[in-house]
Amino acid sequence: MDKNKIEQKKPGLNQKGVEEDSPLRLTADLEGNYLLDERTSEMKWLGIFYSPAGGSVHRVAKMLKKKIGADKVDMFCVNDIQAGKLLDYKNLILVCSSLGRSTWEREQRDRWAKFFPGMRKISLKDRFVALVGLGDHVTYPKNFVDGMGYMAELVTGLGGTLVGKTSTDGYVYEDSTAVIDDLFVG
């Protein structure tokens, strides 16, 4: 992924690397706790989209929904919907695993891989998108959370605005396409 292709707004960052002016503020600590501020918890019309079903990604999507408020969030597994469903929401959270572009393009078993062609046909202009990537730095140290990096490239290419960055401090890995300016894109 060409790191210059991802265009992100550069609002002020606080000491944790979180955007101050972002409408959606989501960060994670090293234990996997997802932290939301009060502005985020007051939002409505937020869609969480995840894959694969079951396992850690699904668990994290459910944790986010509960933390934000089940009455304020709709949650979908991409296995069960068409990409146009993203257009029903101004604010999106996309939750994925560590796998990267080469795996998604090679193995069509991955539901995100089947979802992406439909996504490429829509515009995410005026949409705010937070990315959550679950990574395994032991098994994938050379492409840690690359799936999130690929999603960032796709979302910005479709006109979406990425929100919510996480500091790389404390993470152990060799390389990741999800890092820009020493911050994870989600």
What are these regions (language model features)?
Residues 16-33, 38:
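Short, low-complexity intrinsically disordered segments enriched in A/P/G/S/L with frequent Arg
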